[in-house]
Each structure stands twice: as C-alpha cells, then as structure tokens.
C-alpha cells in the first residue's frame, strides 16, 4: 500500500464493491487518457466542462475532473444531484461540455423543460456519457432534448475508471479502446 495514493471502489450494484488502489502513475495515466477522450469528443482547452458525475469513491467525478484539467479545460465540479442547481450553474457558467450519466442528463433536460428553457438557449454542445448502459434511442432523446452531440465513454473501476475507451465525435459509432494503454481479451 505504500505506493497507493488513492482508493476508489465500484458501485457494488451486484454485490460488495470492488476496492482498487491507484498509484500516482495510475492517476497520471488516467488523467491523460480522459484528456485524450475529451479531445476525441471534440473538447478543446478553451472549453468549460460541467462535471455532474458523483465525486467520491466512484471513479466518474474525479476521473472527469482531472482529465479535463489535464486537457486545459475549465472545470465546474458540480457532482451529482441538486438538479435545480445543475441547471442554474449551466445557465450561469455556460459550459460547452457536460460529463454525466445518460439517465441523469435526461433528468437535467426535464428541469430545463420545466423552466421553459429551450435547447437552443443552452450553452452545451457536447455531452460525454458513461457509468451505465445506454443505447441509440436514449442518445437520440438526449441529443434532441439538450441540443447536443452525445458521446459514449467507457471505463471501470477495476481498470482505470472512465477513459478506457471513448467515441469520436465525427462518427459516434461506438467507443474505441485506447490500445496503447489497454489490451482487451475476449474470453
């Protein structure tokens, strides 16, 4: 444990959470691959990123946060919940990118609708969604309700959190594994 600088854990949805220790090299590599994923999703150093993944033992919030900083972006570390405040922060800070679960993005979209805020009035251009399964139907709904490009990012606590694979904004045809860091094995 002397090289471990951070502990993360899986959600434990199907049992006891899997706890994983990360070294400083793991954290640095992770920040680099999330930054690369942001660029693949169309992000640039000029962008503001609204991080609405939860912070804590779950890898989503901190992975998105440090990757966005590594990419040179301005981070709005909102975390999860507080939907009314999420919408207010988006309207106030005008981020171009949101990183959140796809299901919670629809909750945020419902709040925009409740406030009669139309997609064209929202600053968001891209959403990077992960941490749960979603399909093309949900992608279409998110894109329509928020007026954004919806991009899939993949990760898992046991390997490195979000950023193991990510879609490219030009094609949106499924996440690509960063094969210079990961070797998938299909059993």
Model-derived regions: residue spans:
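Short, structured coil segments at secondary-structure junctions
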Residues: 71-72, 93, 123, 145-149
């Amino acid at each position: 444990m002397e090289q471990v600088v951070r502990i993360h854990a899986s959600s434990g949805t199907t049992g006891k959470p899997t706890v994983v220790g990360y070294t400083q090299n793991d954290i640095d590599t992770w920040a680099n691959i999330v930054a690369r994923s942001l660029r693949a999703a169309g992000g640039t150093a000029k962008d503001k990123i609204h991080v609405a993944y939860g912070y804590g033992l779950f890898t989503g919030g901190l992975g998105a946060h440090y990757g966005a900083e590594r990419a040179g972006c301005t981070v709005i570390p909102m975390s999860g919940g507080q939907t009314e405040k999420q919408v207010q922060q988006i309207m106030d800070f005008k981020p171009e990118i949101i990183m959140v679960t796809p299901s919670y993005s629809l909750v945020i979209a419902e709040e925009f609708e409740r406030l009669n805020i139309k997609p064209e009035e929202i600053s968001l251009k891209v959403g990077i969604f992960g941490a749960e399964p979603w399909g093309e139907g949900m992608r279409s709904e998110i894109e329509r309700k928020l007026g954004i490009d919806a991009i899939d990012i993949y990760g898992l606590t046991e390997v490195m959190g979000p950023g193991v694979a990510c879609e490219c904004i030009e094609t949106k045809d499924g996440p690509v594994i960063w094969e210079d860091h990961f070797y998938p094995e299909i059993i």
